[in-house]
Structures are given as C-alpha cells and as structure tokens.
Amino acid sequence: MSLQEQFDQAASNVRNLKSLPSDNDLLELYALFKQASAGDADPANRPGLLDLKGKAKFDAWHKKAGLSKEDAQKAYIAKVESLIASLGLQ
C-alpha cells in the first residue's frame, strides 16, 4: 500500500474512533493533516483575534512549517495508529 493510500486510510479511521481524542490530539491531527495536504500555513491567513478555535488550529498547523508532505503523512499515520491503540475503532 502506498504512503498516500495509508494516509487516506488513516484519515478514514479517525472518523471511526470509539471516543473523541483529547483537544491536544485533535489539534495535532489537524496540523499534520493540513501540512500533508496543503503544505505550510500562510501567516497572512491567520484567523482574527476573536476566533480562538481557528487561531489554535492555525497555530498548530503553522508549527509544522517546513515538514515535508511525506513526513507529515508518516507522522499523521503514526498518530492515528497510536489513537487506535488507546481508543479503539467502532
């Protein structure tokens, strides 16, 4: 199975976890997914001051700047596998 196929499968598995991951885990998943699919975050697109959730998500993604698509995919897959081991799938 190719890396892209493994990444796509991991993204599908996230939706089938038995319980919701912690906020920190969700931010990590979001950041790795965005880095793998869109590349580096553009600081000019950072959400406004009052959008706390949007800022947290953007900042988590921005911290992954410079991480290659492949490395982000591998990290995402590893994170999902870790969550499956601790939370299980439905």
Curated annotation (Swiss-Prot):
<feature type="binding site">
    <location>
        <position position="57"/>
    </location>
    <ligand>
        <name>an acyl-CoA</name>
    </ligand>
</feature>
<feature type="domain" description="ACB">
    <location>
        <begin position="3"/>
        <end position="89"/>
    </location>
</feature>
<feature type="binding site">
    <location>
        <begin position="30"/>
        <end position="34"/>
    </location>
    <ligand>
        <name>an acyl-CoA</name>
    </ligand>
</feature>
<protein>
    <recommendedName>
        <fullName>Acyl-CoA-binding protein homolog</fullName>
    </recommendedName>
</protein>
<dbReference type="InterPro" id="IPR000582">
    <property type="entry name" value="Acyl-CoA-binding_protein"/>
</dbReference>
<dbReference type="InterPro" id="IPR035984">
    <property type="entry name" value="Acyl-CoA-binding_sf"/>
</dbReference>
<dbReference type="GO" id="GO:0006631">
    <property type="term" value="P:fatty acid metabolic process"/>
</dbReference>
<keyword id="KW-0813">Transport</keyword>
<dbReference type="InterPro" id="IPR022408">
    <property type="entry name" value="Acyl-CoA-binding_prot_CS"/>
</dbReference>
<feature type="binding site">
    <location>
        <position position="53"/>
    </location>
    <ligand>
        <name>an acyl-CoA</name>
    </ligand>
</feature>
<keyword id="KW-0446">Lipid-binding</keyword>
<dbReference type="Pfam" id="PF00887">
    <property type="entry name" value="ACBP"/>
</dbReference>
<comment type="function">
    <text>Binds medium- and long-chain acyl-CoA esters with very high affinity and may function as an intracellular carrier of acyl-CoA esters.</text>
</comment>
<feature type="binding site">
    <location>
        <position position="15"/>
    </location>
    <ligand>
        <name>an acyl-CoA</name>
    </ligand>
</feature>
<feature type="binding site">
    <location>
        <position position="76"/>
    </location>
    <ligand>
        <name>an acyl-CoA</name>
    </ligand>
</feature>
<dbReference type="GO" id="GO:0000062">
    <property type="term" value="F:fatty-acyl-CoA binding"/>
</dbReference>
<dbReference type="InterPro" id="IPR014352">
    <property type="entry name" value="FERM/acyl-CoA-bd_prot_sf"/>
</dbReference>
<comment type="similarity">
    <text>Belongs to the ACBP family.</text>
</comment>
